Amino acid sequence: KNVRTLADLKKFSVGQGVGWDDVKLYEANGISVVEAKYSNLFRMLHYQRFDLFPRGINEIFTEFEKESAQNPDRVIDENILIHYPWPYYFFVSKNNQALHKRLESGLKKMLKDGSFDAIFWKYNGKAIEAVNFKNRRIIEIQNYLLPKATPLHHSSLWFHPKMK
């Protein structure tokens, strides 16, 4: 409950998987990171090798349920939410321009007709509702890993908890 800002968050260490891109992101924001194999992170949290194990909205509830028998003392914090832009990209061979154009055209049509959002909410809505954003303090972290061409200004491409 005492974590209100990024400066407050920097007083804690986070656990992350070896080689995860999030490691660089947290370190670039001045947050101490302990890396380990994913399968060891829950046990390491139990033994206080680090303070926090940030998980994505699409991961936290499933993992919590799966790991709760082995880690009964673990809780999901209900006060804060760490947020940073994290895109998912489609990569295609530069030799397949037809596929590139077809994917881009299809995604643009989906954004325009609302089917992109419908699919997003179909697969993520339950977890997003369970997070209960209105009762959480959102701590924004910069994602310095993003290419300069990342369309951060195109709000229809991003989910942001403040817009929820």
Question: For the regions a protein language model found, what residue spans apply to each?
Answer:
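A conserved helix-loop-strand patch within extracytoplasmic ligand-binding domains
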Residues: 1-19
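Secondary-structure junction motif
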Residues: 14-27, 57
